[in-house]
From Swiss-Prot:
Protein name: Large ribosomal subunit protein bL27
Source species: Aliivibrio fischeri (strain ATCC 700601 / ES114) (Vibrio fischeri)
Keywords from the named record: Ribonucleoprotein, Ribosomal protein
HAMAP family named in the record: Ribosomal_bL27
The encoding gene: rpmA
NCBIfam families (alphabetical): L27
Length: 85
């Protein structure tokens, strides 16, 4: 004979896997061509000089140099560029 009443089922208990987004190379860091600088959803950061943008809005270095973050334009957008060393 059972000594506990049957436990009910739950509809919770799921969560999505983290996507590891964010800045991967910070300002002043040296990068090689092809290095990923920022992984993002949408254009939180925009591509500046010597920076390419992937189809998932990932920013990556097009040339060797140092990473530079700057705020430009009338809408105060954040740009990431690479300055030659």
């Amino acid at each position: 004979m059972a000594h506990k009443k049957a436990g009910g089922s739950t509809r919770n208990g799921r969560d999505s896997e983290s996507k590891r987004l964010g800045v991967k190379r910070f300002g002043g860091e040296s990068v090689l061509a092809g290095n990923i600088i920022v992984r993002q959803r949408g254009t939180k950061f925009h591509a500046g000089t010597n920076v390419g943008i992937g189809k998932d809005h990932t920013l990556f270095a097009l040339s060797e140099g140092k990473v530079k973050f700057e705020v430009k334009g009338p809408k105060n957008r954040k740009f990431v560029s690479i300055e030659a060393e």
